[in-house]
């Protein structure tokens, strides 16, 4: 009897000092052959920072606000995930080869691992940053349900790993700072999750201006409604329920969980919060970025 290899929850692999999901680390070699196009648009975030949200917004912009066109395929087909390489599924590179221009491309890669072609071609980047306390809580629940990640362990032990940058994609602190620095020399629209929650229409307008497009007022209002967390959570084309259960088990925790700012307060203890704040102050010293941990 043939033994079926268990491909779930392998340990992280380090590439240039950055820990990554094993399968994604294996994709980085082939990714060197990736050819960016000047009309590509890169959506980059640290995980759990609003990637799917801004991906849906941008696809709706590209489709002129037509929701039916946006429901043509799941979000991960419409906006291919550059470094994805899950067993038995098409890699990001394979999906991108079949994606007609202009392409929207999703990635969580830090600059050290990003294919140079994206910078050489001056590809526009929409970057979204979210306050790290909510990121840590969301990432913990994502680890519980997404089987390509190592087991998260207890919340307390996961939080320690997060602060030390010993989770997939490494340090949140380094990620948000290096993309902030890049925005001075490269076409990067740097957005904040909390600003998008506070006033989505204002932030969508910024995105429209950045990509050189415009939409009528009523289309904008329609987009705000249909890219809301409530709508996206129940839409199979955005909520990741089309992913095989062996990869994502929504019965453990849904991919789209709460989608709010300040939910960390239901999880962090007073002691954890004090420790986190002290660590944050040290790691973000001298950085001009400021985050709102609640609205």
UniProtKB/Swiss-Prot annotation:
Liver, colon, kidney, lung, brain, spleen, small intestine, placenta and leukocyte. GO terms for biological process: 3'-phosphoadenosine 5'-phosphosulfate metabolic process; cellular response to dopamine; dopamine catabolic process; dopamine metabolic process; epinephrine metabolic process; ethanol catabolic process; flavonoid metabolic process; norepinephrine metabolic process. Changing residue 101 to L: Decreases levels of sulfotransferase activity; 3-fold increase in KM for serotonin. Dopamine binds at residues 86, 106-108, 146. Its EC number is 2.8.2.1. Changing residue 8 to P: No significant effect on KM and Vmax for dopamine, (R)adrenaline, (R)-noradrenaline and serotonin. 3'-phosphoadenylyl sulfate binds at residues 48-53, 130, 138, 193, 227-232, 257-259. It holds the Pfam family Sulfotransfer_1. Changing residue 235 to T: A 5-fold increase in KM and 3-fold decrease in VMAX for (R)-noradrenaline. A 100-fold increase in KM and a 3-fold increase in VMAX for serotonin. A 20-fold increase in KM for (R)-adrenaline. A 2-fold increase in KM for dopamine. It comes from Homo sapiens. It is an enzyme of class 2 (transferase). SUPFAM superfamilies: P-loop containing nucleoside triphosphate hydrolases. InterPro entries: P-loop_NTPase, Sulfotransferase_dom. The gene is SULT1A3. Homodimer. Changing residue 15 to M: No significant effect on KM and Vmax for dopamine, (R)-adrenaline, (R)-noradrenaline and serotonin. Belongs to the sulfotransferase 1 family. This is Sulfotransferase 1A3. The N-terminus is blocked.
């Amino acid at each position: 009897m043939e033994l079926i290899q268990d491909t779930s929850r392998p340990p992280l692999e380090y590439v240039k000092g950055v820990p990554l999901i094993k399968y994604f680390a294996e994709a980085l070699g082939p990714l060197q052959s990736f050819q960016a196009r000047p009309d590509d648009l890169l959506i980059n975030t640290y995980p759990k920072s609003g990637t799917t949200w801004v991906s849906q917004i941008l696809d709706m912009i590209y489709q002129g606000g037509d929701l039916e066109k946006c429901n043509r395929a799941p979000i991960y087909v419409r906006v291919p995930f550059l470094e994805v390489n899950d067993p038995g599924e098409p890699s990001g590179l394979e999906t991108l080869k079949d994606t007609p221009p202009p392409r929207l491309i999703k990635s969580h890669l830090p600059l050290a691992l990003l294919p140079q072609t994206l910078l050489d071609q001056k590809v526009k980047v929409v970057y979204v940053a979210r306050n790290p306390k909510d990121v840590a809580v969301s990432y913990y629940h994502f680890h519980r349900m997404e089987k390509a990640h190592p087991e998260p362990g207890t919340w307390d032990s996961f939080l320690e790993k997060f602060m030390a940058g010993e989770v997939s994609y490494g340090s949140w602190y380094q990620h948000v700072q290096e993309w902030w620095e890049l925005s001075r020399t490269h076409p990067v629209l740097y957005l904040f999750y909390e600003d998008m929650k506070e006033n989505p229409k204002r932030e969508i307008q910024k995105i429209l201006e950045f990509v050189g497009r415009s939409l009528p007022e009523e289309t904008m209002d329609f987009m705000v409604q249909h890219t809301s967390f409530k709508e996206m959570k129940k839409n199979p084309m955005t909520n990741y329920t089309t992913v095989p259960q062996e990869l994502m088990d929504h019965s453990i925790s849904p991919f789209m969980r709460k989608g709010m700012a300040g939910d960390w307060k239901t999880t962090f203890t007073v002691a954890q919060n004090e420790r986190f704040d002290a660590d944050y102050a040290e790691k973000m010293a001298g950085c001009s970025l400021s985050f709102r941990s609640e609205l």
